[in-house]
């Protein structure tokens, strides 16, 4: 389990005046374990849109590390990814695409939908794997690219203090996420790429990405 970092506060500050609903972020609280959590309003906003669920009915477990299954499901739901625009001769099975994703699990459809919509999931991804900050950030940016003009945006590289620790497969998407304010560095410029990401931090990052998409829709 991981506690929230102070960079979460910075990320939240960039979007406090925005809302997924067009109204105030404040809404009737559903979860009972968010009282002292940075990102409480963002989590509740995602819940009220039907994008995320708790571990139990009124329990989000914000400080728990998010698993691959939970993270992929959050991204698919939040970005409303689907297979509607893809034609298949035969419907794909998880076992055709992954080695560790079962064909009949609660998360099965999310993994299939995510990878076929361009989210860079590895074939050997383990649904129980605890996601790191760099992994989840990369997944979010790939989902965001589906409905935005990100490939056309010129990004000025950001100086990341622990940039040499980044997996080269994720460094580009992390640069985008930091540059666009979807995630932030801590006050010393560290990203902490290998650190496990909490469910609260993952939700805040997802919220920020949706707010960016709302403010910068794809241009025809």
Q: Which sequence ranges carry the predicted segments?
A:
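Feature responds to low-complexity, polar/acidic, surface-exposed segments characteristic
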Residues: 2-40, 53-69, 76-106, 116-134, ...
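Conserved active-site-adjacent core of cysteine acyl-enzyme catalytic domains
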Residues: 109
